[in-house]
């Protein structure tokens, strides 16, 4: 990832999504990322499986966040997608660090290199 600026693009910043669960966020992301060539087949199942095994919710001072991602094999082109849901979406806390987190911002990392 030599050009970090290319990771952040306006086309991958989304506001006011009506999503009640992480699965709904992931399904909407797949609908945006797949047609643009950012993800490979199987991404949706992979991100759900990884989130179940390794939750990504983080309680932060300014805004609670979640940082879902999957294995590099499901990323066709590196990216960072940002979702600001209309209402917070509950994610389990990272590394079992407390209660579930009401994420106000979801930052999906598409990392193609381990």
Question: Which role fits each region the language model picked out?
Answer:
Residues 1-114:
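Cytosolic covalent-transfer regions centered on His/Cys nucleophiles
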């Amino acid at each position: 990832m030599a050009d970090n600026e290319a990771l952040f693009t306006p086309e991958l910043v989304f506001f006011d999504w009506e999503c009640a669960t992480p699965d709904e966020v992931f399904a909407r992301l797949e609908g945006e990322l797949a047609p643009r060539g950012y993800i490979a087949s199987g991404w949706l199942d992979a991100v759900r499986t990884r989130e179940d095994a390794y939750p990504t919710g983080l309680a932060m001072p300014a805004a609670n966040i979640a940082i879902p991602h999957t294995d590099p094999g499901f990323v066709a082109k590196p990216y960072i997608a940002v979702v600001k849901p209309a209402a917070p979406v509950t994610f389990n806390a990272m590394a079992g660090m407390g209660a579930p987190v009401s994420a106000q911002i979801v930052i999906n990392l598409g990392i193609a290199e381990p």
